[in-house]
A protein has these predicted regions:
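Residue-level recognition of conserved structural "scaffold" positions that shape functional pockets
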Residues: 77, 89, 122, 213, ...
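Compositionally biased, intrinsically disordered low-complexity regions enriched in proline and serine
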Residues: 58, 81, 135, 143, ...
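RNA substrate-recognition surfaces in RNA-acting enzymes
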Residues: 223-265
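Compositionally biased, intrinsically disordered low-complexity regions
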Residues: 117, 150, 157, 231-232, ...
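RNA pseudouridine synthases
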Residues: 1-165, 280-292, 299
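Active-site flanking residues adjacent to catalytic metal/cofactor-binding acidic residues
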Residues: 65, 213, 224
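The conserved catalytic core of RNA pseudouridine synthases
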Residues: 99-131, 139, 143, 162-220, ...
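Short Pro/Gly-enriched beta-strand edge/turn motifs at strand-loop
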Residues: 35-38, 167-170, 182, 242-248
Length: 301
């Protein structure tokens, strides 16, 4: 329909000669036009699947789950099964749906991001938690290993984020804040290893790939974040076994080094403050241990 085409253009899903264009773009003879339309709602296609979940907390209104890396949160193009939503439908009945008709979900994590995710079990919880996210009263803390020696002990990144016009699978920072949605990330250094830094991030907003894009924007791409160039080895060291060391780290941690460590919110029923924390997963912990050892090598720096 005309409306769907207009929405696709506004969302950056219409490409002319491999470049995303705006609705008022005028095409010329021999231009190659490609349109990607969103799939219809998945609520009629969803099926329950017996996928194990690490449930940290559960009551009549909500669930806190420690998501493993590699688990997609909800079905989408290329991932119609094997997702967190499929698992939720198996383990929990009659979950409320959000505005996107995704059962129980009030926020999401990227596929390769591990850590805590909050799920609503009741309509009361769905509304309350959604309101808390909207009002920015939910506290979310992440830990990430990033490339480079982050000089400042702490800082704030305030820069709009929107879809990359050249690659719709990526997001991009628009520093003039004229394009995209407002995005604010607070970070602080936890530990420095010379060529990488362990940081903690607190989000004021929850944009797609926010930490990954913001850290790349300030020159500190997440370690092994392939989509944003974090799988490219930082050069400059004279340490003879440096490349071998990094390759070994990549094998241990075949994903971006990002973990949703803490989530805090008010319980929808009694308004009691609840805070949950999860340990770093084994893959990130092993890589950190290796960096602690090798960064002390006399030839490393």
């Amino acid at each position: 329909s005309r409306n769907k085409i207009q929405m696709a253009a506004k969302s950056g899903f219409i490409f002319v000669n491999e470049t995303s264009v705006k609705p008022n773009f005028k095409i010329k003879p021999k231009d190659v036009v490609k349109v990607t339309l969103p799939h219809p709602p998945f609520e009629n296609l969803l099926k329950s699947e017996k996928i194990p979940l690490n449930v940290v907390f559960e009551d009549d209104h909500l669930i806190v789950i420690n998501k493993e890396a590699g688990l997609v949160v909800h079905p989408g193009h290329g991932n119609y099964s094997g997702t967190l939503v499929n698992a939720l439908l198996y383990h929990f009945k009659n979950l409320p749906v959000n505005s996107n008709e995704r059962p129980g979900l009030v926020h999401r994590l990227d596929k390769e991001t591990s850590g805590l995710i909050l799920v609503a079990k009741s309509n009361l919880a769905m509304k309350s938690l959604a309101d808390q996210f909207y009002n920015k009263t939910i506290n979310r803390t992440y830990q990430a290993l990033v490339w480079g020696n982050v000089q400042k002990d702490n800082g704030t990144i305030n820069a709009n984020i929107a879809r990359d016009l050249k690659n719709r699978l990526k997001m991009f920072v628009y520093a003039d804040n004229e394009i995209g949605k407002k995005a604010i990330t607070h970070y602080k250094v936890i530990e420095r290893f010379g060529y990488v830094t362990l940081i903690e991030c607190n989000l004021e907003t929850g944009r797609t790939h926010q930490i990954r894009v913001h850290m790349k924007h300030i020159g500190h791409t997440l370690f092994n974040d392939e989509r944003y160039g974090g799988n490219i080895i930082l050069k400059g060291t004279k340490f003879s076994k440096y490349k071998q060391f990094i390759d070994n780290c990549f094998k241990i941690l075949p994903r971006q080094a990002l973990h949703a460590k803490t989530i805090g919110f008010k319980h929808p029923l009694n308004q009691k403050k609840m805070v949950f924390t999860s340990d770093l997963p084994e893959d990130i912990s092993q890589v950190l241990k290796k960096w602690r050892t090798y960064s002390k090598h006399k030839d490393f720096l």
